[in-house]
A protein has these predicted regions:
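Short functional linear segments
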Residues: 150-199, 206-208, 212-217, 224
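Conserved acetyl-CoA-binding loop-helix of GNAT-fold acetyltransferases
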Residues: 97-110
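C-terminal helical cap/extension that packs against the catalytic core
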Residues: 347-362, 376-379, 444-445, 453, ...
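Conserved GNAT acetyl-CoA-binding A-motif
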Residues: 111-123
């Protein structure tokens, strides 16, 4: 048999389950769902005995299992391996003459972007042939069957897809369309084991620390983070490798009509692609970073084993409110029924909101404490929960982020075991681009994505350890730039404000108003001038801004 058949583990069969008898209404409607771990007992009962090894199959990240229900009774099951291979089909004998078999096959085909295969015998060959499967390989009365899924080639390259996605409207006031889309798509996100990480600052760093430890322990980890620092593909990664352009084109050609029908936003499309890609790649765990707020964020369709809040800051006040309590309520929107909510936030008004929302959802809050003894220098070290932690950064704010990651890891350790050495090595090895990152020596140039009041305050704590400082600053117009510049002026009087191409940018003139700073509307010119500085150059104010600067400097 050819190499592609090696992953077909189960004999594809259509037959009775343990001799049970069912009264069948030939006109009845059937309901379908993607199986979760809560369905284990029902599946075992349906199959009469657990020769299917249900528990292990449901935990296998490469397998997606579909169930057919008649009322509250399972009558059919189909397993899809790697989103490309039908590896198990089982339908109750009394439902052989209904549409269950056909509808299970059609359901599987919705999740396939190119080609679907199955491996069967002579007895069931005709069934698959009736549904346009063709024999690819025959060996010892066993058949490898293939069916090509018809897809219109609307996009020929990634640039076309990116242009299409960018053209979709942003929507932050409602999640209804996306929830309906995912529901009608049988909620594939429920297949993923994931952690949902929100908060104002530190989400990306916390995600990165968590990912690195899990990777050290041998797990395959999917991460969804935003915004992208270098390339838009970077927001979706598996073990640090971004999704490739060809895969995005494949998904776009397959699902564009569905995206358009439900009027999905750019971010919603990207979340859907991430979900499908993580399933296809068979990740052991997925880490989803909230984009904006929580309640109405597109990532809020996931079903996490843990929800996390890094902290609360006054950011995106136009959408989330202008008080800590109102922002906390939006962030707490990711709390799920029965799922704990972990937070490093200490403000009483925020914690009050968290406890209130957790109570509504029959959940509970896990408050974490920061390390007490921290040793600062060119790198940072501390002892925490029995671990000795060495950070490969001088950014003070990474103490809180790494400590939160340690608490996340300890919470999920029962399901994802790791050694203490894995944690210490992973935390040390973790490097997060754009967060107090040195990108040039002589002069020393450090970029930092501080982009709001609290982020700039945290940046200040690390930057004040330096002397002879020059700063290049730019920001979006909806940020508290007045506070950020006041903070930066306490570090240095040598500040150049500039501007970059972004629809929400603040102009250099707007930033400079009321402040004794230099103005240079050409950010590249400002960077070139900074090369003659004899001390340290900090470039900060916006993740979007430093992504451009970072790429420019590193490409030289």
């Amino acid at each position: 048999m050819p190499a592609q058949t090696r992953i077909i583990h189960y004999y594809v069969c259509l037959g009775a389950a343990g001799g049970k008898e069912w009264k069948v209404n030939m006109n009845e409607n059937f309901e379908y769902k993607i199986a979760t771990r809560e369905d284990i007992d029902a599946i075992v009962q349906f199959l009469a005995r657990d020769y299917y090894e249900t528990s292990r199959a449901l935990k296998d990240p490469c397998k997606m299992i579909f169930l057919a229900y008649s009322g509250e009774v399972i009558v059919g099951i189909l397993e899809l391996l790697d989103l490309s291979n039908i590896s198990f089909v089982y339908v109750s004998e009394d439902y052989q003459d209904t549409l269950v078999q056909e509808e299970l096959l059609e359901l599987a085909e919705r999740f396939v972007t190119k080609e679907l295969t199955a491996y069967t015998d002579e007895e069931h060959l005709s069934f698959f042939k009736q549904h346009d499967y063709v024999v690819d390989v025959e060996s010892n009365s066993r058949y490898l069957l293939k069916k090509t899924i018809p897809v219109l080639p609307r996009f020929s390259d990634y640039d076309q897809v990116l242009e299409f996605i960018e053209a979709q409207k942003d929507r932050v006031y409602s999640l209804t369309n996306f929830k309906n889309f995912m529901y009608d798509f049988y909620d594939p996100q429920t297949k993923l084991t994931c952690v949902h990480i929100g908060g104002t600052n530190g989400k990306g760093s916390t995600t990165n620390y968590t990912k690195e430890v899990l990777k050290c322990a041998g797990y395959k980890v999917g991460t969804f983070t935003s915004p992208a620092l270098v390339n838009r593909l970077d927001i979706i990664r598996v073990d640090d490798e971004p999704i490739d352009e060809t895969t995005v084109v494949r998904y776009a050609n397959r699902y564009m009509d569905d995206w358009m029908a439900y009027e999905l936003s750019k971010f919603e499309i990207e979340v859907f692609i991430a979900v499908m890609y993580f399933i296809e790649q068979g990740v052991d765990i997925a880490l989803f970073e909230v984009g904006l707020g929580g309640t109405l964020d597109a990532t809020n369709i996931v079903s996490p084993i843990l929800s996390v809040n890094t902290n609360i800051g006054l950011d995106h006040v136009k959408f989330l409110g202008n008080t800590y309590a109102s922002i906390a309520r939006s962030k707490a929107g990711i709390i799920k029924r029965g799922i704990p909510y972990m937070t490093a936030e200490r403000r009483p008004e925020c914690l009050e909101v968290f406890y209130e929302e957790a109570h509504k959802h029959h959940s509970y809050v896990i408050e974490i404490r920061k390390p007490k003894r921290v040793y600062y220098g060119a790198s940072i070290s501390y002892d925490y929960h029995g671990y000795h932690i060495d950070l490969s950064t001088s950014a003070h704010y990474q103490v809180a982020n790494s400590a939160l990651a340690i608490n996340i890891l300890e919470y999920i350790r029962k399901e994802f075991p790791f050694k203490d050495a894995d944690l210490e090595k992973g935390i040390h090895d973790a490097v997060w681009e754009g967060r107090f990152e040195t990108i040039h020596q002589n002069p020393l140039i450090i970029v930092d994505g501080a982009h709001n009041r609290e982020g700039m305050d945290a940046f200040f704590e690390s930057a004040r350890d330096f002397s002879n400082i020059k700063i290049i600053f730019s920001a979006l117009g909806d940020k508290d730039t007045h506070h950020m510049l006041e903070t930066l002026l306490s570090l240095s009087k040598d500040i150049t404000v500039t501007q970059f191409d972004h629809p929400r940018r603040a102009t250099a003139q707007q930033l400079a108003e009321d402040f004794p700073v230099k103005i240079d509307e050409d950010w590249k010119h400002a960077v070139e001038e900074a090369y003659s500085h004899k001390g340290v150059v900090f470039i900060t104010g916006s993740l979007y801004f430093i992504s451009k600067v970072r790429q420019y400097i590193l490409s030289k």
